[in-house]
Amino acid sequence: MKTFMAKKEEIKREWYVVDAKGKVLGRLASEIAKILRGKHKPIYTPHVDTGDFVIVVNAKDVVLTGKKEQQKIYFFHSGYPGGHRLISAKDMRAKSPEKMIYLAVKGMLPKGPLGRKMLKKLKVYAGPEHPHQAQKPKELNI
């Protein structure tokens, strides 16, 4: 029996919408990463982008467990000497709650060109509204 490898023409992409309200950040991000990679499909191939599009709404209402709201620190660096910035999860939620989910999912995807291509299929919105009604996204319960 020959190993199956998905071809670009065979891949059918779906759109899913996920409500992040009351969901734990890491658990939500791991499920989203699986869908973006395509691991939920029988045609999954590691070196081919077989994943689907994911729309995340209500990102501002995602839950962090324990004391992470005050203690978790996001680190950014510009590449210049002294160009580092530290921001707590509490400040990140106030400034851009979409980025919390984006960074959590980014860390769970492959590093490199394929991972960046998969990450482009993730759309995150702080509130309950999104501009992707034309794609007729399916509700996904995680």
From Swiss-Prot:
Keywords: Ribonucleoprotein, Ribosomal protein. It comes from the Bacteria. Coiled coil: none annotated. GO terms for molecular function: mRNA binding; structural constituent of ribosome. One of its GO terms (cellular component) is cytosolic large ribosomal subunit. One of its GO terms (biological process) is negative regulation of translation. InterPro entries: Ribosomal_uL13, Ribosomal_uL13_bac-type, Ribosomal_uL13_CS, Ribosomal_uL13_sf. The keyword NADP does not apply. Pfam families: Ribosomal_L13. Belongs to the universal ribosomal protein uL13 family. Part of the 50S ribosomal subunit. This protein is one of the early assembly proteins of the 50S ribosomal subunit, although it is not seen to bind rRNA by itself. It is important during the early stages of 50S assembly. This is Large ribosomal subunit protein uL13. It comes from Dictyoglomus thermophilum (strain ATCC 35947 / DSM 3960 / H-6-12).
